[in-house]
């Protein structure tokens, strides 16, 4: 493969576009099925979408299966800049040598250009950034929320204001794991679509159960049959 280089900002913007298009970081081709379970197509990896956008000739398989070129929108540009600032300031700083991943990310984000064989590192950064922000939000919230269940198990909720603090694509299911705050209580549920961090209205839901957070130990009310609006 060619060692041609591209600007770091350009490649990072494409990584954000690929994340937006795929809805998650896809490291290996993922099958997509219809509602009745019939195979439809393979979803391309974020990395190959980025590569083929910049170098279409890289795709040597059937042309009809080639990924569509990514189109960068203003939100991708803004996210790319936010990611560069975040990783430089908070996650890795100027520390070298902790592990290969951190060392490579430090090197890439400190450089003005990225080689094609480094695209894999850049492709995962939007996902890592989203995960780290979510983990920080949940950790902070776990120290501030009230203990106890939001309501009795089995009871119904309607028209409640919520703050979404985490929305992470599930590795095992077709959906997003949501963490939120309602009435200063932490709640969670599985949602069919991604939700933006911030204000949200729980149009309706039911209380499924209440357990301790697997990592922080605070009470978390699990919801189901959730209809949320933003």
Regions found by a protein language model. Name each.
Residues 2-35, 39-41, 156, 195, ...:
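Extended, charge-rich, solvent-exposed interface segments
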Residues 18-137:
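Long, charge-rich alpha-helical interaction segments
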Residues 34, 42, 170-172, 182:
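Acidic surface patches and DE-rich sequence motifs
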Residues 126-174, 202-207:
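Structural detector for short beta-strands of small beta-barrel domains
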Residues 133, 197-199, 214-220:
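N-terminal alpha-helical modules
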Residues 171, 189, 212-214:
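Intrinsically disordered, low-complexity acidic/polar segments
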Residues 174-199:
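Beta-strand/loop nucleic-acid-binding surfaces
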Residues 177-183, 206-230:
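OB-fold/S1-family single-stranded nucleic acid-binding modules
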């Amino acid at each position: 493969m060619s060692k041609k280089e591209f600007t770091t900002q350009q490649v990072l913007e494409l990584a954000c576009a690929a994340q937006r298009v795929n809805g998650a970081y896809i490291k290996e081709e993922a099958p997509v099925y219809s509602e009745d379970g019939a195979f439809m197509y393979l979803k391309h990896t974020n990395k190959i979408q980025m590569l083929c956008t910049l170098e279409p000739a890289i795709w040597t398989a059937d042309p009809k299966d080639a990924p569509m070129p990514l189109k960068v929108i203003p939100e991708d540009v803004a996210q790319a800049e936010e990611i560069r600032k975040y990783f430089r300031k908070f996650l890795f700083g100027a520390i070298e040598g902790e592990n290969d991943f951190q060392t490579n990310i430090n090197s890439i984000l400190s450089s003005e250009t990225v080689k094609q064989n480094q695209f894999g590192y850049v492709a995962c950064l939007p996902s890592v950034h989203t995960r780290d922000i979510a983990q920080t939000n949940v950790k902070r919230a776990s120290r501030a929320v009230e203990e106890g269940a939001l309501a009795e198990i089995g009871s119904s909720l309607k028209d409640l204001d919520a703050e979404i603090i985490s929305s992470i694509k599930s590795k095992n299911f077709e959906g997003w794991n949501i963490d939120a705050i309602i009435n200063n209580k932490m709640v969670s549920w599985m949602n069919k679509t991604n939700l933006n961090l911030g204000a949200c209205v729980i149009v309706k839901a039911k209380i499924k159960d209440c357990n301790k957070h697997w990592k922080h130990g605070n009470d978390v009310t699990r919801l189901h049959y959730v209809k949320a609006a933003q």
